[in-house]
């Protein structure tokens, strides 16, 4: 699979060529809202260079509100409809590599272990993912501390590197090679490959924290005092979960309108008090301390035990957006540092 170059002034032609064969999904700004991953429409100008803050690909693969079943009892008989996403080939562009890796975490939840979510699977099965490494790394990233990021490339179909006036297009699968074969792409020169490698090394070294990857799931402690410290600051707004590209907690709700009942899936978070409230009234997590502990131990220990992947990809959104400045990097440094393990 040969690496390619795409000049930025050829991107509109590249997108048009993609749109002729695929439904193209990319971050789009509409109005004053942050860029969201949407299926491109005529007149859209997608942000595919990773230069701006954006919502996550999760919002496309696992919508914030999705009707799963409709039941209508009009006329005395019940009709049942299960609205499914369209079955069509898609290409996703403009996802930061940490966000693209987060799709792998979602895959473990919704496609593995003998359970397949048909709604998620329909969007995912014909989706080619093209990740992006931007020209400048975000200050909040800490990807290199979490995993062997070298392996992340194998989990996407191609990686685009922003080299200023052009993108370096590196296919990593047969799907990616098919995209690279589009006529707008040219063969990469050795100097371009060197520039790409420099950018890749910058990405891998961004936000390195003082602990080894294994420490994430070996050094977390149930009784660590840090959980109470987090809980004292946390206001349980749920932002860290809702903006996380890999958090997948959801709730099921029924809504009645006349003779029609819709059952839909919507966002939820383990940081809300009623998340673990049971039907008979018992709640095993009545304070914020166990809820704060659950979220981090689930992401960094339990998901690794269950699926073999860490449930965080270091995208830094929770660092940037937490209203009370709980910095997960500081928490991990305190709980997982190799110095602590050796003491």
Residue ranges and their predicted role:
Residues 2-4, 219-220:
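Short, flexible loop segments at the rims of nucleotide/cofactor-binding pockets, characterized by
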Residues 211-232, 250-343:
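Ferredoxin-type iron-sulfur electron-transfer modules in oxidoreductases and energy-metabolism complexes
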Residues 101-237, 241-272:
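Catalytic cores of enzyme domains
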Residues 2, 12-111, 117, 121:
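Non-catalytic, usually N-terminal nucleic-acid engagement modules in DNA/RNA processing proteins
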Residues 96, 238, 242, 320:
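Short alpha-helical basic/polar micro-motif
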Residues 18, 22, 55-63, 67-77, ...:
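A short Gly-Trp-Pro
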Residues 95-97, 133, 316:
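Glycine-rich anion-binding loop/nest that anchors nucleotide
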Residues 7-11:
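N-terminal basic/disordered segments at the start of proteins
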């Amino acid at each position: 699979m040969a690496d390619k170059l795409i000049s930025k002034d050829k991107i509109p032609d590249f997108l048009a060529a993609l749109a002729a064969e695929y439904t193209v999904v990319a971050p789009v700004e509409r109005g004053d809202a942050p860029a969201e991953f949407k299926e491109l429409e005529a007149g859209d100008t997608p942000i595919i260079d990773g230069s701006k803050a954006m919502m996550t690909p999760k919002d496309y693969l696992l919508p914030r509100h999705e009707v799963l079943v409709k039941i209508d009892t009009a006329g005395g008989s019940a009709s049942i409809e299960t609205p499914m996403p369209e079955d069509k080939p898609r290409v996703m562009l403009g996802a930061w590599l940490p966000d693209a890796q987060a799709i792998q975490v979602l895959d473990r939840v919704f496609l593995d272990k003998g359970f397949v979510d048909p709604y998620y699977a329909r969007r995912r099965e014909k989706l080619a993912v093209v990740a992006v490494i931007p020209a400048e790394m975000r200050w909040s990233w800490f990807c290199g501390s979490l995993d062997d990021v070298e392996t992340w490339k194998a989990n996407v179909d191609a990686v685009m590197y922003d080299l200023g006036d052009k993108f370096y297009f590196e296919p990593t699968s047969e799907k990616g090679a098919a995209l690279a074969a589009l006529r707008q792409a040219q063969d990469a020169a050795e100097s371009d490959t060197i520039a790409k490698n420099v950018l890749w090394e910058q990405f891998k070294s961004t936000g390195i924290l003082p602990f080894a990857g294994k420490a994430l799931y070996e050094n977390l402690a149930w009784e660590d005092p840090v959980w109470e410290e987090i809980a004292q600051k946390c206001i349980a707004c749920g932002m860290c979960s809702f903006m996380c590209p890999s958090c997948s907690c959801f709730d099921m709700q029924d809504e009645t309108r006349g003779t029609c009942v819709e059952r839909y899936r919507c966002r939820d978070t383990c940081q809300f008090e009623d998340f673990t409230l049971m039907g008979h009234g018992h709640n095993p997590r009545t304070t914020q301390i166990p809820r704060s502990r659950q979220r981090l131990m689930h992401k960094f220990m339990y998901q690794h035990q269950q699926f073999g992947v860490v449930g965080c990809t270091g995208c830094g959104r929770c660092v940037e957006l937490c209203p009370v400045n709980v910095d997960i990097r500081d928490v991990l440094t305190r709980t997982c540092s190799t110095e602590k393990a050796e003491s």
